Amino acid sequence: LGSFRLSTNSTATSDELGIMAVAYFERFGYRAEDVKACIIGSVVPQVMYSITSAIIKYFGVEPLVVGTDVDTGLKFDPRCYETGRLGTDRAVNCIAALEKYGGPFLILDFGTATTLDAVSREGVYLGGCIPAGVQVSIDGLFQKTALLPRVELVKPDTVLSTTAVGQIQAGAVLGYIGAIEYLIRHAKEEIGQPDTKVVATGGLSRLVADNTELIDVVDPQLVLDGLRIIYERARR
């Protein structure tokens, strides 16, 4: 029906969040009273109270919050050292991919940080890794060096650029894609299942997927599908 992205503001009040959400819903042709149910998955504890209060006040529904008391249905390999402590967004991604594509698969979520998660053919979470996101690398260069400029996040035409901007883009973007390809290859080797699918999601998924042959599926709405699946299971 529609989706929108907002930057996180941990100091936003429930009124600010509620008014903003109502305005975005109206842009898609819906009124607040059209909303009959809500589910929230957050990895920013500071905003949970404000978001929950906003949903109750402006939409009149009690949201289901995906937390430790909500069974996502994801199984964990016993070797995982923090079973059940996987970030909400990552667990939700895995549930969605299991339902939509089946295991085995790797999920790469390209956000502020990049996360890679592996799930077996039997639907068991095997582990993952968290490299820094490409935007973090570019911002770090800008903040920690006096003369290097902040640059746009685009793929350059060459590794050997003749400008400072192009060289930063080559190092950050092309270097990042190379690192992602390395992680995919080695994760597949560790899983040992040749038919492992690679699913990309998150804001930068298209940039990476368009420049590598190792990603099978780009699914920008994966986490939203996962939240829907969890809600439907919880309400059965």
Model-found features: residue ranges?
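Short glycine-rich, Thr/Ser-proximal phosphate-binding strand/loop in the N-terminal lobe
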Residues: L1-F28, G123-P149, V154-T158, G166
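Phosphate-binding/catalytic loop of phosphoryl-transfer enzymes
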Residues: S53, V61-V65, V70-K144, V173-H186
